Regions:
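Transmembrane beta-barrel domains of bacterial outer-membrane proteins
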Residues: 37, 54-56, 66-70, 78-89, ...
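Transmembrane beta-strands of outer-membrane beta-barrel proteins
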Residues: 42-50, 96-102, 149-153, 201-204, ...
């Protein structure tokens, strides 16, 4: 009987061990099944952005004065068709890393963001043009600090400003005066980013100048750099940047200054404030401009966000704010050549005010439209000192309503 009892007990123990082993192996199988492979470092992506801006005044020159990327009144625009080839940096602690980015654009926005020497004279008479927006190598060195030093070599977009060339990073379809004329669009050269601490980044670079690349409009280099702060666990960020150097065609001595402070405050999970402070100075013309833009956005739900933006831009010397009526005139002005369209004009000595309100709609739709964003807006611009720069130089103010559609793929 004792032997039978022992055998029975052993049988129960073996059964329990067997079941436990199966459970363990089954658990391991589930873990292995659920483990996802790491995302590839090399990615191809892109987007399409198309929109229209309605101007009830229907100006004879077809221009929304002071506006670059939504400059055509009552005319649909293919703003951007963009494709990216990128290997982003993803450094491991103490290890060297490398990456690169090539971003190609075809669209009406390219007219204004060209750099001299890269597609700046290609399809110059067309409203839609090609451009190489960015083309650079990125190197990470695990030196000096815990997060090390990054070095960017090539052509890259500017550090400056709240708004960007990439429409997906902007709340509104239209841009501020600050973005259009108060900051550079791109640089070509070398830019170092030193991650001094978890909350402090230092930027320093040498470039060929503002919106230049293979060619330059003079023989001097420029400085581009600044300081970035990431505070309150990311709820407050401050980026103070500058670009300093000779930017006037055939002038290697007189300096141009583009200075900007961008402040982002996450007040609540749904409510965000952005502030853009700007100062520009051109020594050749002894001209300066000041700007301030304030944004507030509120996320109503997962797919709908409302926003408002107010701006004042002081162009008291009448040097900075222009409207380019010819598709190639922006590049002619950058090269120092005379513009050819009589309706490429400035607004005179004017202080501009603008207020914009709109929503961002990101409907929950299936692929291939899963990346759809719709940005309707209304905007009111005015001269605050009785000049008449708007609607074919006939009005003190200008009302527009715009909408664009972005599809990311």
């Amino acid at each position: 009987m004792r032997i039978n009892t022992v055998f029975a007990t052993c049988s129960v123990i073996l059964a329990i061990v067997s079941l436990g082993s199966r459970a363990v192996f089954a658990g391991e199988t589930n873990v292995l099944t659920e483990t996802k492979p790491p995302e590839p470092r090399f990615k191809i992506s892109g987007w399409i952005d198309t929109g229209i801006t309605f101007n009830p005044a229907s100006p004879p020159d077809n221009q929304n004065f002071g506006r670059f990327f939504d400059d055509r009144a009552n005319e649909p625009l293919l703003n951007q068709l963009v494709i990216n080839f990128e290997r982003a940096l993803a450094p491991q602690p103490g290890e060297f890393d490398w990456g690169f980015k090539l971003q190609f654009m075809y669209g009406s926005d390219a007219r204004y963001i060209h750099s001299l020497g890269l597609f700046s004279d290609t399809a110059a008479t067309s409203i839609v043009q090609p451009d190489l927006v960015e083309g650079y190598f990125n190197l990470h060195f695990p030196i000096i600090s815990e997060d090390g030093l990054d070095l960017k070599l090539g052509k890259f977009v500017t550090l400056e400003g709240v708004e960007t060339i990439d429409p997906r990073a902007n709340f509104f379809y239209s841009h501020t005066y600050i973005f259009n004329v108060g900051i550079p669009f791109n640089h070509t050269g070398a830019l170092a980013t030193f991650h001094a601490t978890k909350w402090l980044d230092l930027y320093s670079g040498i470039t060929r100048g503002v919106n230049t690349s293979i060619e330059d409009n003079n023989d001097s280099v420029s400085f581009h750099g600044g300081v970035g702060l990431n505070l309150l666990d990311g709820k407050l960020t401050i980026l103070a940047t500058t670009s300093i150097g000779p930017e006037t065609p055939n002038n290697n001595h007189d300096q141009s200054y583009f200075n900007d402070i961008a402040i982002t405050a996450k007040i609540t999970d749904k409510f965000t404030s952005l502030t853009d402070l700007n100062y520009a100075l051109n020594e050749v013309s002894d001209a300066q401009a000041f700007g301030i833009a304030q944004y507030f956005t509120y996320a109503i739900n997962s797919w709908l966000t409302a926003g408002i933006r107010g701006e004042i831009f002081w162009d008291d010397d009448g040097f900075y704010v222009f409207s380019f009526a010819n598709n190639h005139d922006p590049m002619r002005a950058l090269e120092g050549e005379p513009t050819i369209d009589p309706r490429t004009v400035g607004g005179g000595k004017t202080t501009y005010g603008a207020i914009t309100a709109g929503v961002n709609i990101k409907p929950p739709v299936p692929k291939p439209l899963a990346g759809l964003a719709i940005r309707p807006e209304i905007r009111y611009d005015c001269s605050l000192n009785d000049t008449r720069p708007f609607n074919n130089s006939s009005d003190r103010d200008q009302f527009t309503a715009g909408i664009d559609f972005i599809v990311t793929f």
